[in-house]
Amino acid sequence: VSKDNEIVNDIIDGLSQRLNMRVYDKYPTVKNTGQYPLIIVTRQNASDITPYIRHLDIAITVVTRELSGGTDNTLSAEIGDALTDWYNQSLWDIMGAPLLNTADAQPTKDGRASTVYDYQLEYLS
């Protein structure tokens, strides 16, 4: 398992514990609406900035129970707080504070509201 994937798995575990919710590594099969909101964490891109520093892009997708256009809870504050807490307690050699941006908000195939957060970090490889 690469260090990138270890960090992604650590973020999944950290979010799951801090939000007290199940966090997925790929889009799950939804059996009932009680599973919403869905939180899916995936590795997007990674590249070496220098021989010792690696850049990692992670997408955190939140899919809410509500249909797009309604009022929905994208959990942005909760996710931001949980990621800050994870970072503060992280044992990884992360360079500086990671960036969290809202990358995109668009409906899923079945019309539910979906928000993608782009989490970027650099770490000592």
Regions found by a protein language model. Give the residues of each.
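Charged, amphipathic alpha-helical segments and their flanking helix caps
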Residues: V1-Y24, T42-S125
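A short, hydrophobic beta-strand-centered structural micro-motif
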Residues: T33-Q44
